[in-house]
């Protein structure tokens, strides 16, 4: 759900942090529905609790290198307001805080991970107490995680996946069609 919502949001002049935070809220809603978090998705994101499950940014620019130089602009221009907002919401792991412009090539890759060492660290430090249900989370310690990446180019009116609409199957219906169920 987060992946497709993010893909629909990528458009010229859209603040990247808004897209990143939308992905976090959608993922938090899913974790709440599984009983792994309590409260509201907004509270989980504001507390930084989603960094336990998505300890990376939503994506990155692509250009001369696979991971293009996001931080160059942040060193050259004053993004202090955005950086302050990111630090407060626990999204300081998001490297790209720019506004999206036509011609930008970037990735859309929200993910969810269950990293035992990170879970243990946050639990021991009492982080996200009242938000994360660490006892329920124990059942997912061996799950690992998942992240699906699409590469996107921003157009004058929106965006499109590089390679067109052809992608690997990712939904339950798509996967069942491939395996013949």
Which role fits each region the language model picked out?
Residues 1-181:
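Active-site neighborhoods and metal-handling regions in enzymes and metal-associated proteins
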